[in-house]
């Protein structure tokens, strides 16, 4: 299973994170498929490549709870839900 999750960077007590797409079996700071964003909890800075995130979710990637909460602060989960709903409607119309 492919997950969108956080990869920890930085030194002790000064963590920052990359938002990455990785295999669920890979270690937290191990190999990843693609980096799609960055998050700094100290300055609350969050950068996300929205197109890449939406594309990975369309392809079946699952969000971890922390990444889902970060997406929710950016209102990105609403965009994702609308894209997924429109695809379901299009698939139903195509099957008719």
Swiss-Prot record:
Keywords of this entry: Ribonucleoprotein, Ribosomal protein
GO molecular function, one term: structural constituent of ribosome
GO cellular component: cytoplasm; small ribosomal subunit
Keyword flag Cytoplasm: no
InterPro entries, A to Z: Ribosomal_bS16 (IPR000307), Ribosomal_bS16_dom_sf (IPR023803)
Biological process annotations from GO: translation
Ribosomal protein recorded as keyword: yes
Highest taxon in the source lineage: Bacteria
Entries under Pfam families matching the protein: Ribosomal_S16
PANTHER family tied to this protein: 30S RIBOSOMAL PROTEIN S16 (PTHR12919), SMALL RIBOSOMAL SUBUNIT PROTEIN BS16M (PTHR12919:SF20)
Family: Belongs to the bacterial ribosomal protein bS16 family.
Protein name: Small ribosomal subunit protein bS16
Organism expressing this protein natively: Mycoplasmopsis agalactiae (strain NCTC 10123 / CIP 59.7 / PG2)
């Amino acid at each position: 299973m492919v997950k969108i999750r956080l990869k920890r960077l930085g030194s002790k007590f000064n963590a920052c994170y990359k938002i990455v797409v990785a295999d669920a079996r890979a270690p937290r700071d191990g190999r990843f498929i693609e980096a799609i964003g960055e998050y700094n909890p100290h300055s609350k800075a969050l950068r996300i490549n929205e197109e890449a995130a939406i594309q990975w979710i369309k392809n079946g990637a699952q969000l971890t709870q922390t990444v889902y909460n970060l997406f929710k602060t950016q209102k990105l989960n609403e965009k994702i839900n609308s894209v997924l709903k429109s695809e379901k409607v299009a698939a139903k119309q195509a099957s008719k």
